[in-house]
């Protein structure tokens, strides 16, 4: 019975990823595009770009060819095969599409966002996939999450970065808004990047999340944040966020209802980080061009 349940869980995950790829690969007929007005044609082309890139992102995922006692999923990023243990009964121990989008962005934009020797912290690291990719790209990484998730997080990070990463990643507890001055004193923190994937959803700690962003940011810190929009509550968080930070939409994935943002503290923008163009999703040999 246990073996059957494991098989059912893994087959469900396979089907889920296959469906995402299938949906991401749907295009309008060329004749239909020809009959559209120019503005609609532009939207159609952008929709096609979005679906093409989403399909490429989802193709980075694979599942085991055999049933294992512990469910895991595989990913190809930063030139490595990454294996992630999940716990499907916990939000923080499942790989969500937002994490895949952020991993793909980091990998395909290494010139604009070079992580080598940079100090990077991920909040709400969950399974650790984003932190693993950042580490494999050369960053000093601190992966953080709630205490009950740290065991699985540490296991995944150690398993996938040992002997592979330039710098050994750290795993630390971070409950948003709790003991920030004690655990992350402002005088000693100096993060170049804050990474966050799908940390905004219908939970009661959005104000604490905002406080945490503000506490961890220096005037030159860059936040790379991927967000899936689900409810009006999330839109209100974005409004609150923009009171403290200059927020720039880098890219949008309508087929996933996901947006990728870059942010820095308001009125403190350094000349080192000029305004960038929208990240246009154009796959060229598996890469994206700005």
UniProtKB/Swiss-Prot annotation:
State the Gene3D superfamilies in the record. Answer: Vaccinia Virus protein VP39
> Mind listing the UniProt keywords for this protein, alphabetically?
Methyltransferase, S-adenosyl-L-methionine, Transferase
Select a single GO molecular function from the record's annotations and give it: protein methyltransferase activity
What are the GO BP annotations of this UniProt entry? methylation
The protein's superkingdom reads Eukaryota
Q: Does the keyword Cell wall biogenesis/degradation apply?
A: no
Q: What does this protein do?
A: Protein-lysine methyltransferase.
Entry similarity comment? Belongs to the methyltransferase superfamily. METTL21 family.
Q: Give the protein name, as stated in the record.
A: Protein-lysine methyltransferase METTL21E
State the organism of origin. Bos taurus
